[in-house]
Amino acid sequence: MTKLSRRQVAGGILAGSTALAMPSLAFGALPRVVVVGGGAGGATAARYIAKDSKGAVDVTLVEASKRYYTCFYSNLYLGGFRNYGSIGHNYYGLATNRGVNVVHEWATSVDAGKKVVNLGHGGQVSYDKLVLSPGISLKYDSIP
């Protein structure tokens, strides 16, 4: 009979609990991270999760728009020093350089119990970890 130390038992419990926390790991699949929102916060989160994991995490970015127009440098556009297109960015670099799966669709709801993001066309994207970065929404009618 093989003797196990307390440290080995604790390590086994930790490994087993990791599989429970991220069910895809129990079946040998990569852990899945879904980022909702492709603005400055969401795109940056997706980029660095993919970059820092070195391919060990399956990263999906859900963003309805094909281009993001940044607030950064917008004053240069407003001042006439840059054209409007220069402050727009697509998601091609995230997909090709970082391996991020980009889904151009509205995220309509999240089912935290099932760990899925429901999409506007009726599809779903499952996740182990979720990052919500939907940006802001202004209520123009609330300004007197």
Indicate residue ranges for each PLM-predicted region.
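Beta1-alpha1 glycine-rich phosphate/pyrophosphate-binding loop at the start
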Residues: F27-N101
